[in-house]
């Protein structure tokens, strides 16, 4: 057994660039401002257009990277849909902007869509008392509780563009006769 990881590609895509991993499948990599410093996203050729899988965090910098990708790699074809695999901000953060930019639908499970919509609308100066009490009961140390109390509540909204009001529920959809 090898003691190092082997990667199938010698290079990773830089900001605004892609790597073709299979016919009609482009790997896009967007930066994240944390220890895990990137997210892998995908462009799938979809007949007369493209499907985006996951979107990156809300930021004008990432929107600029997407604009570079659109200009250089879509071959003049539109984006037909955006699929968010789940509701974390790095996966759905640019969904509102992308769907508005391309006038296309967001595809996501109903539960993740509802949760993302709820979290994006709930920004408060401090967390609700029951949220603080929950973390106290599960054993958060006092300093962590103080940090939680004083950090504001609703940071999810800072990492996402407005979540589209409409969506296509992924559980019942198919792409190219295959389940999503």
Regions found by a protein language model. Name each.
Residues 5, 14-17, 159-161:
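Glycine-rich, flexible loop/turn motifs
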Residues 1-10:
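N-terminal presequences and immediately downstream first alpha-helices
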Residues 61, 67-172:
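Active-site HxH/HxHxD metal-binding segment of metal-dependent hydrolases
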